[in-house]
Amino acid sequence: LVQMSVSDMNYKEIPEEVEFTEKIGAIAFNLYFLVCTGRGQGNTDISNAAYEEALKMLYEQQMKYKGKLMINSKCAPQYKRVVYENDPDSVYTRTYSGGCPAATHYSRISPEGNLTPCPFIEESVGNLKSRSFKDLWENAPLMIQLRDRKQLDGKCGTCEFSAMCSGCRARAFAETGNYMDPDPSCDYEPGKHGGKAITLKVEDTLGLEVEFQTQWTPEAKERLERIPSF
């Protein structure tokens, strides 16, 4: 596995780094985009123009090394939009999780037991010493808000790709103090693809809201009951 953090200084080296990844026999390449929060607030972020170009370069490499390398972006929900613009039927669009993963696919638990929606969001929604993970995940107001794409403001709220992208909520908060404001790293202007919300078939929307019921065996239920956080 090779991982690269992208910036204005090195984004043009993406093809070389992917080539290097294959050359050394690695099976995966991840391109990380800085989220300027916490200790990263004073770091130099990539410009919006370079951000978009880097995503397009990554897609080109994904096609070039298809079947040879697993190539992915991290902290760049807009990548799914770039893939869709090139190939609406891409396996990546159909099976990769939809949008910002904060409160939808992952969260963070601090050493003190505080639960936050994302490693880049510092606001705690509660502590696992007093409330279960399940309770906080399902009922904490901030977790519910972040999962509701209808609450997105500005161009993220009117974007055709809000369901599959939604922008980075940590970047929005770092910029304006509002979790639902537009992602400042994105220059895409809604309307380019007609303005109508683009949705995928339910069976193709891993990570988006799908109704299902989990069936637990009696043995599994017994084991779960012994775990305090659940």
What are these regions (language model features)?
Residues 206-230:
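Non-catalytic accessory segments flanking P-loop/AAA+ NTPase cores
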